Amino acid sequence: MAQTKIKAGGFDPDVITGTTALAAVPASTDELIISDAGTLKRIDFTHIQSHLVPISSVALTGNTNPVRFDDVFSATYNKYQLILTDLCPQTDDVSVRFRFRDGSSTLEASNTYEHVSFGVQSDENDTTTLSTNNDDNIQIGHKALGHSAATSGISGIIFVNDPQSTSNYANIHYDLKTADGDGFTLYKTSGAGAYKHAVSTAVEGFELTCSSNGFTSGRIDIFGVKNA
């Protein structure tokens, strides 16, 4: 039987719509068809997929405290990005705290964390620093304070490097934007922290808490970072 060339006007969409839909992210070896200057070619999905792989997310409402994620760190990836978007506590002037979790348990014993940060704000030239050597959490945000106004939410990235490692302390570093209670003064904060109780602890999750009340709005997205 002679082959017939399919042209734009003679292509029946049912060729695609009538086929079983893929209900997940394509595997790296799945193939797609593209047009390269008019020439059809096939390409493995691995060449075009993002290096950020969605793992989990939550949109916060009400008065949530703590916000917990279990089983989000695994041997599949050794780097993770936690994206915070307009995270707002219920009340002003509260500390926002990060803790690792091991299975279903929060790692929160005294004198097991250390953290350091520096920040600047839009109405001052001075740099504010915060450093703590023995704590039960990692405080994040400018002067460790969060504010409740929608224009004052915490946004930015927390980077988690190799949390499943048993040869280094579980640690984070972050780059965040916050603001004062009315949202007019912007704060930029960078910092780092580590759980230093045991090198052999392979953490599997984390939680964010407020020193009082909880979070009323905002979003947290977790991505695994594929190695290039």
Regions found by a protein language model. Give the residues of each.
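Cleaved targeting-peptide boundary
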Residues: 2-4
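Surface-exposed molecular-recognition determinants
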Residues: 8-20, 30-40, 44-228
